[in-house]
Amino acid sequence: MPDSTINPPQASRILQGPAPDINNLPDLAMDSESLKEDYRHYFAHYLGRDHNCRNLHYHYEALALTLRARLMERWKNTIAAYDSARTRKAHYMSLEFLMGRALSNTLLNLGVTDGTTHALHDLGLLLEDLESAEPDAGLGNGGLGRLAACFLDSCATLALPVKGYGLRYEYGMF
């Protein structure tokens, strides 16, 4: 009869000892030239598009990924600061969020609106065209979803340690 105790699998050799320093990277630059190069990288290598692609959706996606990488740096630094200070956090759960479009707000919060405008101009694109290509990120159908979005946006503006949670659903509305 086999032994009834369950032995955990052995940890991989890479997980033993000190943690590998894979996240120690220089901060991403916010200047126009760096934004342009990262945009081109995401457009060509991540999305697999070339100069013949005229679909604004892919251009919007490349810009969103470029900005997301910069937001992730700030997000990780914020989490580390809250964790090291043992800050209490609030968690907000809602069945719906009507966040709306976020591109222009993200550009403003990162302080890269002018740099992005210049980078896109150098690539033959207009920021306004990409802003119009952004899909609406609404999840829900009413006032409570808008209230939830406003609450989280206010918390972010005030730099409060709040996370929002929701249900992701694919078919229909609540």
Feature roles, as predicted:
Residues 2-174:
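A conserved ligand/cofactor-binding region detector
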